[in-house]
UniProtKB/Swiss-Prot annotation:
Protein known as: Histidine protein kinase SaeS
Membrane topology designation: Multi-pass membrane protein
Ranges of residues in domain Histidine kinase: 130-349
GO cellular component entries: plasma membrane
Name of the gene: saeS
Function statement: Member of the two-component regulatory system SaeR/SaeS. Probably functions as a membrane-associated protein kinase that upon sensing the appropriate signal, autophosphorylates and in turn activates the cytosolic response regulator SaeR.
EC number: 2.7.13.3
Enzyme class, UniProt record, top EC level: transferase
Length: 352
């Protein structure tokens, strides 16, 4: 179906009105409402008026048509992912200007969304590449020691015991890597958690109990300092446990055996917030890198992840979970002295 242009439709409309007016005048003449001279005068006047109307309409309609053509070109450029430049000096009716402004806003939002998607895809690709690289080391270790045990290459009882210990460590490392992958995938699923009444002492017992044997083996000192008068409060338990677990893992990984770790809990009643700090005596973080440690693809040092068995995603996961529960994580670190990570939580009021 052929669609006429705006200019053609206006011309057709004017011609149609002239023809219709002429027909009415002829009928009026036949019915003797007007004499011949008056009918001719009215017909000529109608034609002249119509021509003037058409000319005036053309003068006013041309800028509108040009703006629509420009808008059409800009739309095609946007579809073809070409950069378009909007002429702000070009005059147009209010409705067309509003349409143009709406289109520009839509294009801007779409471009932002597309850039965000591209960046996320790029980051996901980097994460997968990093994790694939991390998986090779424990898998290679498991394979080599398994083959050694199978073929009898490792036969001395002490060596066999050490081989089993290494296999267990590498299996645990794989478990940590897959656990990190699962948490990264779940971060953007919009998962919600119920508010729970949290007792700090019970929360710390649940978090620290799995580390008890590890802390003893490494001859570490773990001190917990908090006021006993801190009342129970409502918060989201699963994210908090995961955040503190990741922060504690980070403190253990990047500090030496025999060193001290402090967990300090304080309350600011004026702002209704709880602060939980985990302080280590580890290697520390240089100032220029402290603002980047929560990035998804950032690693302070690849060799350290190989040594500690981590994926480098622990702090990223912790920070993302903190944002989801309206909390925050801050870092204070001195190179070769230690690092303090502080989780600040709001105390929510339970609403039934």
């Amino acid at each position: 179906m052929t669609i006429f242009s705006i200019r053609s439709q206006i011309i057709i409309g004017v011609i149609s009105s002239v023809i219709l007016t002429t027909i009415i005048l002829v009928i009026a003449y036949k019915l003797m409402w007007f004499n011949g001279h008056m009918t001719l005068t009215l017909a000529i006047t109608t034609m002249i008026t119509s021509c003037l109307t058409l000319s005036i309409c053309s003068i006013f309609i041309n800028p509108l048509i040009q703006k629509i053509k420009q808008f059409n070109i800009k739309t095609k450029q946007f579809i073809n992912h070409e950069k378009f430049i909007d002429d702000e000096t070009f005059q147009s009716p209010r409705e067309i200007k509003e349409l143009n402004d709406s289109f520009n806003k839509m294009a801007y939002e779409i471009n932002n969304q597309m850039n965000m998607i591209k960046n996320e895809q790029q980051e996901k690709t980097e994460i997968i590449q990093n994790l694939a690289h991390d998986l090779k080391t424990p898998l290679a270790g498991i394979r080599s020691y398994s083959e050694g045990l199978r073929d009898g290459v490792i036969s001395d009882p002490q060596e066999v015991h050490e081989a089993y210990e290494i296999l267990i460590k590498q299996a645990n490392r794989l478990s940590i890597l897959f656990d990190d992958i699962t948490h990264v995938i779940n971060l953007n699923t919009g998962r919600s958690y119920p508010l729970e009444l949290i007792q700090l002492d019970q929360l710390l017992v649940n978090i620290l109990q799995p580390y008890e044997q590890h802390i003893k083996q490494e001859n570490r000192t773990l001190e917990v300092n908090f006021c006993t008068d801190i009342d129970a409060f409502y918060q989201y338990r699963p994210p908090i446990e995961r955040i503190l677990t990741n922060l504690l893992d980070n403190a253990l990984k990047f500090s030496n055996s025999g060193s001290r770790i402090d967990i300090i809990i304080s309350e600011c009643k004026e702002n209704d917030v709880i602060s939980i700090s985990i302080k280590d005596e580890g290697i520390g973080i240089v100032p220029e890198l402290q603002s980047r440690i929560f990035e998804r693809t950032f690693r302070v040092e690849d060799s350290r992840n190989t040594k500690t068995g981590g994926s480098g995603l622990g702090l990223y996961i912790a920070n993302e979970l903190a944002q989801q529960i309206d909390a925050s994580i801050t870092v204070q670190s001195d190179l070769d002295i230690g690092t303090t990570m502080t989780l600040t939580l709001k105390k929510f009021q339970f609403k039934k």
